[in-house]
Amino acid sequence: MENMKVLLGFICLIVPLLSLETDKCTEYPNEVISFSSVNEIDIRSCPLTPNEMHGGTIIWYKNDSKTPISADKDSRIHQQNEHLWFVPAKMEDSGYYYCIMRNSTYCLKTKITMSVLENDPGLCYNTQASFIQRLHVAGDGSLVCPYLDFFKDENNELPKVQWYKNCKPLPLDDGNFFGFKNKLMVMNVAEEHRGNYTCRTSYTYQGKQYPVTRVITFITIDDSKRDRPVIMSPRNETMEADPGSTIQLICNVTGQFTDLVYWKWNGSEIEWDDPILAEDYQFLEHPSAKRKYTLITTLNVSEVKSQFYRYPFICFVKNTHILETAHVRLVYPVPDFKNYLIGGFAIFTATAVFCACIYKVFKVDIVLWYRDSCSDFLPRKASDGRTYDAYVLYPKTYGEGSFAYLDTFVFKLLPEVLEGQFGYKLFICGRDDYVGEDTIEVTNENVKRSRRLIIILVRDMGSFSCLGQSSEEQIAIYDALIREGIKIILLELEKIQDYEKMPESIQFIKQKHGAICWSGDFKERPQSAKTRFWKNLRYQMPAQRRSPLSKHHLLTLDPVLDTKEKLQAETHLPLG
């Protein structure tokens, strides 16, 4: 399994190299020179900024080799993440190494010259690998053992450091020196303190312990006057934090390397073993000023407690002559009403869309339910002066011919439901007019007295007078569309696919209002008003307050039908 992981890691490194020959990498002109001690473990990072390395892949090469350095942790020289490891460094490792960073848009290349050195004769170090650090005479300061961040343990703690001066153990109990993490604190700096200091530690890698050594050339500065440190952040500010959350407080200072930067809360410094508060230190050379550094002390708060809101966290910057402070006060977050508004608006919109969809699907049922349930509680409308709820217009047969299903629907089924069950009042020519009356006058008068015009259509219009071509139909449609503004309801007793043979007025009504298609049979039996046809027809009819017609009145419809059938052949001439 371990070999498989190594193989996969190597494949992941080698795949981006397939296009190496064709890609042009931008090479940094500045060369980085690095020194290492022979037989010691050493780790080198790619000297690019975090912004330059963001989103990219780091690959290391030695000299002019086209083969990347191995990612196998068992190799003495190998790449681990973006770092180059020497476990340990050997004299033959000297040379130059290329760190190449590439992503989907660009490629950066930087050169590092590596020198692996042996100790100078009679010394425990090589002077070429020395780091120069300076402190002011008569002041307090610290020497820092550099580049130990790579060797933190699993608890993110720096290793224990031993200090030597001129290769002899340095006593840390004489009042002038004491050790603190990776720092050697020097109190009341004097000229005799200058010299070469060595810090030593060790690091265990894959079960084997390797030495780590750094040498520092300590130079004293006679003039103790120095610039005042500047706290870049915080600036006496407040910070919103939720109770129980994890936060970081960053104290960013521009000052001298020896300035102390630390946090206090409620008058006390942060203890090193505090389970909730922990400090982390970092220093960088200032990019725009010589002999100045960016000192960053981060206070990690693993859990915001209620007492943290009572007192501010104070950042202190201290040297021999100056003490600067700045604070951060934690406050409870202000409720973000914007999210509530957005959420409420989203819920309202979703509800509105849902209701609109429900209404569109069940519109007919909702309107009919409202009429049946709430009409008694609404104020009565003023009378519109009309007598009939609908004027029924249907095709007339030529001569003595008759279509029984049409007569059954017009004179039996339609009145039975609309008049018998829902109390509507219909005017049906041939039932409600009198023998001998002028058809044009009857039509003109009764259309004006009706609230709706129901036009009944059948598929085979060839056996009927054409709707809209006889005087009766022309008057009815004209009055409904033009003069009276009456709503027209088209009823298809049979499914009609082609309306091109229909009069233009019928085509216009069909296009604008559609038609209701009959889906039942024409047997003379009680009709259920709960079918979709009758619901759609009732929806198109005006709201009704009257009670259904009595059973006695309904029984009179059949004699009327018989009278119609008997008189039709005698008095009713085909229209058209």
Curated annotation (Swiss-Prot):
GO biological process: cellular response to glucose stimulus; cytokine-mediated signaling pathway; heat acclimation; inflammatory response; interleukin-1-mediated signaling pathway; positive regulation of canonical NF-kappaB signal transduction; positive regulation of interleukin-1-mediated signaling pathway; positive regulation of neuron migration
Enzyme class: hydrolase
Modified residues (Phosphotyrosine): 499
GO terms under cellular component: axon; cell surface; external side of plasma membrane; extracellular space; membrane; plasma membrane; protein-containing complex
Phosphothreonine modifications at: 556
Cytoplasmic side: 360-576
SUPFAM superfamilies per record: Immunoglobulin (SSF48726), Toll/Interleukin receptor TIR domain (SSF52200)
Enzyme active site: 473
UniProt domain TIR: residue ranges: 386-541
Extracellular topological intervals: 20-338
Superkingdom to which the source organism belongs: Eukaryota
Its membrane topology: Single-pass type I membrane protein
Catalysed reaction equations from the record: NAD(+) + H2O = ADP-D-ribose + nicotinamide + H(+)
Disulfide bonds: 25-107, 46-99, 145-199, 251-315
Its EC number(s): 3.2.2.6
Record PTM: A soluble form (sIL1R1) is probably produced by proteolytic cleavage at the cell surface (shedding).
Pfam families (alphabetical): Ig_2, Ig_6, TIR
Any one Gene Ontology molecular-function term assigned to this protein's record: interleukin-1 receptor activity
UniProt keyword Phosphoprotein, yes or no: yes
Subcellular location: Membrane; Cell membrane; Secreted
Primary role: Receptor for IL1A, IL1B and IL1RN. After binding to interleukin-1 associates with the coreceptor IL1RAP to form the high affinity interleukin-1 receptor complex which mediates interleukin-1-dependent activation of NF-kappa-B, MAPK and other pathways. Signaling involves the recruitment of adapter molecules such as TOLLIP, MYD88, and IRAK1 or IRAK2 via the respective TIR domains of the receptor/coreceptor subunits. Binds ligands with comparable affinity and binding of antagonist IL1RN prevents association with IL1RAP to form a signaling complex.
Entry's family note: Belongs to the interleukin-1 receptor family.
Domain remarks: The TIR domain mediates NAD(+) hydrolase (NADase) activity. Self-association of TIR domains is required for NADase activity.
Protein name: Interleukin-1 receptor type 1
